[in-house]
Amino acid sequence: MPGIKLTPRDSFDDAYRKFKRQSDRNLIVTEARARQHYETKTEKRKKEKIATRKKILKKLFMLRRYESRL
């Protein structure tokens, strides 16, 4: 659980912002959403395959974009 240190000057908005940033860094919300429903091994492999493909296409796009500037 993320813990934040507050000073007497911090408002509620500041405290909330710090807490939200800390929880985003620790991937708490992402992990909770992932654990909400059971994911079979085939679904995991399928997601990994899609993510890998996206990553490759992104690199290819960036490479082509860079080459067009030369």
Curated annotation (Swiss-Prot):
Source organism, top-level taxon: Bacteria
Entry-linked InterPro entries: Ribosomal_bS21, Ribosomal_bS21_sf
Keywords per UniProt: Ribonucleoprotein, Ribosomal protein
Gene Ontology terms for molecular function: structural constituent of ribosome
The keyword Cytoplasm is assigned to this record: no
Single GO biological process annotation from the record: translation
GO cellular component terms given for this protein: ribonucleoprotein complex; ribosome
Pfam families found in the cross-reference section: Ribosomal_S21
Family: Belongs to the bacterial ribosomal protein bS21 family.
Name the UniProt record assigns to this protein: Small ribosomal subunit protein bS21
Organism: Sulfurovum sp. (strain NBC37-1)
Gene field: rpsU
